[in-house]
């Protein structure tokens, strides 16, 4: 029996980075959701087989083609250390909850079969936004897809990698070491620049 090719749907798609990565890994992109015209034109040209659904706020996961993997890299503006740090519940970054809603709707429609995996990408500042409570809310939201709750208290600091193991699911995270080092690299560069003036 041949292995079934994995399928992918990308929310907050940008220019199709998850789809391109998926193709390189043998995963077939099926749909995307994006509102910015230029990135949509890029993916329409590079990935004409991918169906574009537009604004994530107007989507219902039950109406989307069921996929094995849903990816989301929603706007990081409100949790980024480069931004105002308004947090996960702010207007742009709060779109994260649309990702979880769509996953739940698709799982309900498919009797829990799809999606099998969810991939969330964001900035390193998501760990520290709102003193770490925003990342806890992300984990709680993903656990809620399976109807579970996190009982552990929020740690003083989120580690760069970790996991939550449920009876029939798991959640894992890993922060890019490059992303962690970036603020330190910038600080040192600014110090060098200040000394040279």
Regions found by a protein language model. Name each.
Residues 1-197:
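Conserved active-site and SAM-binding loop architecture
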């Amino acid at each position: 029996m041949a292995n079934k090719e994995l399928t992918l749907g990308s929310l907050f798609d940008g220019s199709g980075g998850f789809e391109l990565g998926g193709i390189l890994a043998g995963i077939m992109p099926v749909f995307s959701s994006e509102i910015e015209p230029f990135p949509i034109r890029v993916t329409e040209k590079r990935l004409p087989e991918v169906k574009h659904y537009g604004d994530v706020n107007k989507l219902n996961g039950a109406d989307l083609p069921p996929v094995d993997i849903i990816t989301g890299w929603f706007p990081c503006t409100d949790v980024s250390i480069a931004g105002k740090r308004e947090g996960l519940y702010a207007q742009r970054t709060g779109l994260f909850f649309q990702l979880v809603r769509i996953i739940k709707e698709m799982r309900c429609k498919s009797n829990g079969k799809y999606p099998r995996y969810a991939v969330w990408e964001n900035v390193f500042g998501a760990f520290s936004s709102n003193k770490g409570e925003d990342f806890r809310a992300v984990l709680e939201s993903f656990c809620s897809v399976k109807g579970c709750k996190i009982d552990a208290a929020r740690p003083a600091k989120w580690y760069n990698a970790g996991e939550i193991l449920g009876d029939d699911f798991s959640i894992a995270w890993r922060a890019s070491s490059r992303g962690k080092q970036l603020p330190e690299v910038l600080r040192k560069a600014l110090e060098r620049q200040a000394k040279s003036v």
